[in-house]
Amino acid sequence: PATEGQFGKDITMESWRQAVKKVGFEDLIEAGLGGDMTTCSEAEEWLEAYRNGEKKTTSCCPGFVNMIRKHYPDLADMISTTVSPMCAVSRMIKAKDPDAVTVFVGPCVAKKSEVADQKIEGNADYALNYNEILAIMKAKDVELEPAENTYQDSTIFGKFYGNSGGVTDSVLEYMKETEQNEDIKVCKANGAAECKKALMFLQRGRLPEDFIEGMA
């Protein structure tokens, strides 16, 4: 979902779909669909933890997860077990075609470390940042061209995952729609500094909120 709007208002998901097919990919599926898929799982996990008096952190940002595992290993058990939207979409594709090779494209370099983690079954096989996919397109003489925004896989809530606080917005909306209106409070940490501060409070038992949404 972070791809929309990054290259001008006229460059849509359909623009990207046409371009990647020209360079040799079979098709494009929006990672925001994975946001829709994982929101349900994330919400149920949050609700269970909340009702048990436990605190949790989100798991969709690999930079944040790496920060916890490296610098706050005692908090690793608090990381949500819900897979990232990237992984959810990859698993869906591979369920339909076990021989498919899946490639994630986005702005986050840390996605490469998530791909390299072989413990995550069914995850994307490769991750490319924007510079890399644009270099491939340039080598193939392919350009992103304006196209009508007709190609959408995800809802607006799946697209929220591309913004800080988006996971929280999606999960709380899901809870509202399913009439599970618990008074859950979330610390929205955007950037490494805010993530470190939130984790320090959690580590010391001083985090007032129930969950941390971390986007490092």
Across the structure, where does each feature detected by a protein language model lie?
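Iron-sulfur-associated redox domains of electron-transfer enzymes in respiratory
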Residues: 1-216
